[in-house]
């Protein structure tokens, strides 16, 4: 397990990285800034494992892994996991937590484009959760993910739809009213409509397999997957 450094390429937003660097030490605080990620992780993991036909014995790449919440959980399922992120502090937190947990994850600090140039076609599963809305060129990330997965392999994306409801729910509600995430975490202008994401996907070797919404109920304080992609959504694609 390591946390290598590498040169930065064009597709990096240093202000976005700084946001997560500032709160990296709280990544594994179940009641802290990343509480929502811990809450939705079982749903994400279950969706990925089910759609990919299980994770045991598979080689998996988690793009934009942050502090390693999803990466660790996939490793616990028996996958060989590499976590990729451009934030140095989140990767250090991820590396330390994996050591404390006895979980083997290989953490690398480089962009997905750089990784794709060296490791094309090497992964059974690639995940890219809540990362596309934090980079200048999300289409470039989609292309790189397509290059990294093996023929017949699975690629999963999750992001936020761009509309009035998602602004109210993800920005006004989550950041300012419920204070579920730090203020300034999201910029609605960077949210991605499903049609836009699918438009990028069809320009690669990937094919859409399934899409689902991720829904939060503030009354019951619960999350669930289901129809409706007007706020958070997940997309399963497969390499042709």
Swiss-Prot record:
UniProt-annotated binding residues for S-adenosyl-L-methionine: 44, 64, 85, 129
Pathway stated in the Swiss-Prot or TrEMBL entry: Cofactor biosynthesis; ubiquinone biosynthesis
InterPro entries, per the entry: SAM-dependent_MTases_sf (IPR029063), UbiG_MeTrfase (IPR010233)
Record Pfam families: Methyltransf_23
Membrane-crossing segments per the record: none
Catalytic activity: a 3-demethylubiquinol + S-adenosyl-L-methionine = a ubiquinol + S-adenosyl-L-homocysteine + H(+); a 3-(all-trans-polyprenyl)benzene-1,2-diol + S-adenosyl-L-methionine = a 2-methoxy-6-(all-trans-polyprenyl)phenol + S-adenosyl-L-homocysteine + H(+)
Key words of the record: Methyltransferase, S-adenosyl-L-methionine, Transferase, Ubiquinone biosynthesis
GO BP of this protein: methylation
Enzyme Commission code(s) on record: 2.1.1.222, 2.1.1.64
Disulfide bond positions: none
GO molecular function per UniProt: 2-polyprenyl-6-hydroxyphenol methylase activity; 3-demethylubiquinol 3-O-methyltransferase activity; polyprenyldihydroxybenzoate methyltransferase activity
Function according to Swiss-Prot or TrEMBL: O-methyltransferase that catalyzes the 2 O-methylation steps in the ubiquinone biosynthetic pathway.
HAMAP family: UbiG (MF_00472)
Protein's UniProt name: Ubiquinone biosynthesis O-methyltransferase
Organism: Escherichia coli O6:H1 (strain CFT073 / ATCC 700928 / UPEC)
Taxonomic classification: Bacteria, Pseudomonadati, Pseudomonadota, Gammaproteobacteria, Enterobacterales
């Amino acid at each position: 397990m390591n946390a290598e450094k590498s040169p930065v390429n064009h597709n990096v937003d240093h202000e976005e990285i700084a946001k997560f660097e500032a709160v990296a030490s709280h990544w594994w605080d179940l009641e802290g800034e990343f509480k929502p990620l811990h809450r939705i992780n079982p749903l994400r993991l279950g969706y990925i494992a089910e759609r990919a036909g299980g994770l045991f014995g598979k080689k998996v790449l988690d793009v934009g892994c942050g502090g390693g919440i999803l990466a660790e959980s996939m490793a616990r399922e028996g996958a060989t996991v590499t976590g990729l992120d451009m934030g140095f502090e989140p990767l250090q937190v991820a590396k330390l937590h994996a050591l404390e947990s006895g979980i083997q994850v290989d953490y690398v600090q480089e962009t997905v484009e750089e990784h794709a140039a060296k490791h094309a076609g090497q992964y059974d599963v690639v995940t890219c959760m809540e990362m596309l809305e934090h980079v200048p060129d999300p289409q470039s990330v989609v292309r790189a993910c397509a290059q990294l997965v093996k023929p017949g392999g699975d690629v999963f994306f999750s992001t936020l739809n761009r509309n009035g409801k998602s602004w109210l729910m993800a920005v006004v509600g989550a950041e300012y009213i419920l204070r579920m995430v730090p203020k300034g975490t999201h910029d609605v202008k960077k949210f991605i409509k499903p049609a836009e994401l699918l438009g990028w996907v069809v320009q690669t070797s990937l094919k859409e397999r399934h899409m689902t919404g991720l829904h939060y109920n503030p009354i019951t304080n619960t999350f669930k997957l289901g129809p409706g992609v007007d706020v958070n959504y997940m997309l399963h694609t497969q390499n042709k």
